[in-house]
Amino acid sequence: MNLIDLILIAIYVIGISGLIFNKNNIINILIISELNLGTLGMLFVLASVELNDILGELSGLYILTFTAAESAIGLAIVVILYSKTGIINIRHLNKLKG
């Protein structure tokens, strides 16, 4: 394990702790999930380079497309929630019933 792997693992652990401590704000949750999935994709690519295997790079590309779709859906939910309630709080998601 080299220094870059350790830094990426530390960033992932910081992201998980951010998810544990920031449960109310949707924007924070989206940013933290983007950070975690981006870090996970980079770890897959680094492992793929170290093992000389293409599967990790393809997994990194799949994770990148998944995070793009996740952020688009998450931001759409945030816009709808803010237009209905005026508050961006995860506790108000039950007001989106329609």
From Swiss-Prot:
InterPro entries: NADH_UbQ_OxRdtase_chain4L/K, NUOK/Mnh_C1-like. It comes from the Eukaryota. Its main location: mitochondrion. Its EC number is 7.1.1.2. GO terms for biological process: ATP synthesis coupled electron transport. It is a multi-pass membrane protein. It catalyses: a ubiquinone + NADH + 5 H(+)(in) = a ubiquinol + NAD(+) + 4 H(+)(out). Pfam families: Oxidored_q2. Gene3D superfamilies: 1.10.287.3510. Keywords: Electron transport, Membrane, Mitochondrion, NAD, Respiratory chain, Translocase, Transmembrane, Transmembrane helix, Transport, Ubiquinone. It is found in: Mitochondrion membrane. GO terms for cellular component: mitochondrial membrane; respiratory chain complex I. The chain crosses the membrane at residues 1-21, 26-46, 61-81. One of its GO terms (molecular function) is NADH dehydrogenase (ubiquinone) activity. Belongs to the complex I subunit 4L family. Core subunit of the mitochondrial membrane respiratory chain NADH dehydrogenase (Complex I) that is believed to belong to the minimal assembly required for catalysis. Complex I functions in the transfer of electrons from NADH to the respiratory chain. The immediate electron acceptor for the enzyme is believed to be ubiquinone. This is NADH-ubiquinone oxidoreductase chain 4L.
